[in-house]
């Protein structure tokens, strides 16, 4: 299985488009699309392709408070042979993530973040499908 391991090509390529639009001073809309091809993340597959679409509006309520809403769609494909039409896929999975985050910075050195996140994965791999809900509170103190 690993006899040709040393002769594999471990180069990677990333194609990324990011657009940031600020219709007002308090509202920012960030859209990004990227595709990454990286065979080195899984030594058993010849190639790994990741496609991501992310939409992240940010609303700055005041100098100390802001809200973020994220929608992200990610598609990962591990493929045995990159020169075929895609019938050799080892793994094909979709991950959809959304979150609402509140940021508060009462001083220059303290940041408080609170996030509610939902993720859903559909996969034909070992881990199959899952749904996750996450709520967290983060406190950062910087000197």
Which residues fall in each region the model found?
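Gram-negative and organellar
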Residues: 1-143
